[in-house]
UniProtKB/Swiss-Prot annotation:
The gene is anmK. Pathway: Amino-sugar metabolism; 1,6-anhydro-N-acetylmuramate degradation; Cell wall biogenesis; peptidoglycan recycling. Keywords: ATP-binding, Carbohydrate metabolism, Kinase, Nucleotide-binding, Transferase. InterPro entries: Anhydro_N_Ac-Mur_kinase (IPR005338), ATPase_NBD (IPR043129). One of its GO terms (molecular function) is phosphotransferase activity, alcohol group as acceptor. This is Anhydro-N-acetylmuramic acid kinase.
């Protein structure tokens, strides 16, 4: 089955789109990537999304218009990705997250909430292709975090017979899936995963701040590599209660966003840091937060760490991860084991759509999300009659 996967992550860079050919069933899948592209948002639309994510007051009418605008961009990406290729049978669209709130165990019946714009009904109507969307809602309704949702895809495509592996997504927010060796007894019961905290989001915001928007990220980590990290600041930032919270857990820009960055910059200036050293220290914060999370919550450090997402191209971040993990962990991108690291998240939502529509196969991992049960993920939007 030819499936399209669509997602725009917390970095709000644009829409990652892929066309894949999926065959097989359950966890025994073959997934071939035919094409992957990123379609940047128009700048005005991106700024509207970022403003809404930052909590800027917006009228219901404006949100409705933004929802439609995002759906149109997603539909256009779906149409473009399949040009000159076999037409898609199915679309899996994550949409654009504008708000994510984990469950609050201190309140009675306080489910989490996750809100994505770019409604699937509109995408199905505009493309003429059956679309699955709203993937997080079922897991959240079952008491889960609704995140991370890629872990079952990691199990399916990246687990190994003998190696302890971690798959670390370095998007705006980082998330990890721990994959014990398949040779271990009851290995699937030992899988775990969670959001590790900020990956690119704070560095991206700082780069945009310091360049007045001319640059949106630190390419290859070249800017941060020129500075010196201030470890006492990293020590201070790691006192954030999120990092000590036991998995399952998830987070987003609601915590690690523009306000958090502003507070970090104020504190950095008190310590006499310039812009370069601040970027270096933020990158060190990402590296140390990831490794500290592993040390706290994994049964052991991984034999192999597989990176994906935009941060997988940040050579300085990779260098700092290697330093803190030590030489016993080999770090690679998922490309090195056959899964495109730039479009892994888009591929994941194509697979989740396939499981939902074609097989009625649960897509979540309750050990990872905290849901009370396996769930069918996503709402199915059929092609309108007469299309």
């Amino acid at each position: 089955m030819y499936c399209i996967g669509l997602i725009s992550g917390t970095s709000v860079d644009g829409i990652d789109a892929c066309l894949v050919d999926i065959s097989g069933s359950g966890l025994d899948l073959k997934v071939d990537l035919l094409r992957g592209e990123t379609y940047p948002y128009p700048d005005a639309l991106r700024q509207e999304i970022l403003a809404l994510c930052a909590g800027t007051p917006v009228s219901p009418e404006a949100i409705a218009f933004l929802d439609d605008s995002i759906a149109k961009e997603f539909a256009q990406a779906a149409q473009q990705i399949q040009q000159s290729l076999p037409p898609a049978d199915l679309i899996g669209s994550h949409g654009q997250t504008i708000f994510h709130r984990p469950p609050n165990p201190e309140k009675a019946f306080s489910l989490g909430y996750s809100w994505q714009l770019g409604r699937g009904e509109a995408i199905a109507n505009l493309t003429g292709i059956t679309t699955v969307s709203n993937f997080r809602a079922a897991d959240i309704a079952a008491g889960g975090q609704g995140a991370p949702l890629v872990s079952k895809i990691d199990v399916c495509l990246l687990s190994h017979q003998n190696e302890h592996r971690c798959v670390q997504n370095l998007g705006g927010i980082g998330n990890v899936t721990y994959l014990p060796p398949r040779s271990q007894t009851n290995w699937q019961e030992k899988i775990c995963g969670w959001d590790t905290g900020p990956a690119n989001v704070l560095v991206d915001l700082a780069v945009q701040k310091f360049t007045q928007g001319e640059k949106t990220y630190d390419q290859g980590g070249q800017w941060a590599a020129q500075g010196k990290p201030r470890q006492e600041l990293v020590d201070q930032w790691l006192q954030e209660p999120f990092f000590e919270q036991y998995p399952p857990k998830s987070t987003g820009r609601e915590l690690f966003g523009a306000l958090y960055l502003d507070n970090c910059w104020i504190e950095a200036q008190r310590h006499g840091l310039n812009e370069t050293d601040f970027l270096t220290t933020l990158t060190e914060f990402t590296a140390r937060s990831v490794v500290t999370e592993y040390q706290r919550f994994l049964p052991q450090l991984p034999d192999r760490l597989l990176l994906c997402g935009g941060g997988a191209h940040n050579l300085y971040l990779r260098e700092r991860l290697q330093y803190h993990l030590g030489s016993n962990t080999k770090i690679q991108r998922t490309d090195d084991v056959g899964l495109n690291s730039d479009f892994k998240e888009a591929i994941a939502f194509a697979v989740l759509a396939y499981w939902r529509f074609q097989e009625q196969f649960p897509g979540n991992v309750p050990l990872v999300t905290g849901a009370s049960q396996d769930c069918l993920l996503g709402d199915i939007h059929l092609v309108p009659v007469g299309s």
